[in-house]
From Swiss-Prot:
Organism, scientific name: Chlamydia trachomatis serovar D (strain ATCC VR-885 / DSM 19411 / UW-3/Cx)
Enzyme class at the top of the EC tree: hydrolase
Protein family (similarity comment): Belongs to the SurE nucleotidase family.
Protein name per its UniProtKB record: 5'-nucleotidase SurE
DNA repair found in the keyword field: no
Length: 283
């Protein structure tokens, strides 16, 4: 019997290499035990940096003694996109990666928040280099994450994303719901992102002479009258998996044929077999 080749997975994030979310993701991947894990993540938090990278100032890369067993780990004094660029162009230029994961982010990345998210920015960068990738985010707070059965689900997500062959490398944006009443997650849903987004309200924190300092961390939801599939899935306690598009087309989206092929592939995969029918919930 032929032994299945272990995947080579790069893990990054935007909350920083010491964040709880990336540690949780690594523990789940280690539990599933199907891949060799490499970590290249920012030394400090980089939330909201989108696809920004260090164009002028040098970026430092140094080995990092990660507390869990991984093949190798490095910390970067830059953004998640810096991490991906350094991984692809320097660290693994002679030994290609199979997949790049970003997360698990502390807070959701859905709707139009994708334009701001550095968690998602890393995935778009991976796709531009021809590498399949997945962004993973936990709504509200990483404390809401439910570990039961998630190691096998994340393995299925990874294997599906690597195996998916169509026109471009696949990028998935996965969001886990926040179950404030501790009710178990119901399954996973293939969705499309909508127009919902978080906007920051300027808050004056101090004044020094003529200079005023503000924060934009007070985030509020703005929801359109017609809820998106992604929004409804999360609201109904389902994990959402939405495709990301990195190619530059006039529509800046998947064609109807590409979307139908991807949706059909997803629904027939091991992911969908483990999920529940959402038609009544999302009608």
């Amino acid at each position: 019997m032929t032994e299945t080749r272990r995947l080579r997975i790069l893990i990054t994030n935007d909350d920083g290499i010491k964040a709880k979310g990336i540690s949780l993701l690594i523990s789940l991947l280690r539990e599933a035990d199907f891949a060799d894990l490499y970590v290249v993540a920012p030394l400090e938090e980089q939330s909201g940096r989108s696809m920004a990278f260090s164009l002028v100032e040098p970026t430092a890369l140094e080995p990092f003694d990660y507390p869990q067993r991984v093949q190798e780990a490095w910390a970067v004094t830059g953004t998640p996109v810096d991490c991906v660029k350094l991984a692809i162009g320097e660290l693994f230029k002679e030994n290609a990666l199979d997949l790049i994961l970003s997360g698990i982010n502390n807070g959701k990345n859905s709707g139009r928040c994708l334009y701001y998210s550095a968690t998602v920015g890393a995935i778009r960068e991976a796709n531009l280099h021809g590498i399949p990738a997945i962004a993973l985010s936990q709504s509200e707070n990483i404390a809401f994450f439910q570990k039961a059965h998630m190691a096998s689900l994340i393995r299925s997500l990874c294997e599906f994303t690597v195996a998916y062959k169509h026109t471009d490398p696949l990028g998935l944006n996965v969001n886990f719901p926040a179950s404030t009443d501790d009710s178990p997650w119901k399954g996973i849903r293939f969705t499309l992102s909508g127009n919902e987004f978080l906007f920051g309200i300027p808050r004056l924190v101090r004044t020094e002479g003529n200079r005023r300092y503000y924060t934009l961390y007070d985030m509020r939801d703005k929801v359109s009258e017609e809820f998106s599939e992604e929004y409804l899935a999360l609201a109904n306690n389902y994990i959402s998996a939405a495709p990301l598009v990195s190619k530059n087309t006039p529509r800046a989206t998947l064609s109807e044929e590409e979307l139908a092929f991807l949706k059909d592939s997803f629904e027939q995969s091991v992911l969908w077999k483990a999920s529940l029918n959402l038609e009544e919930d999302l009608a």
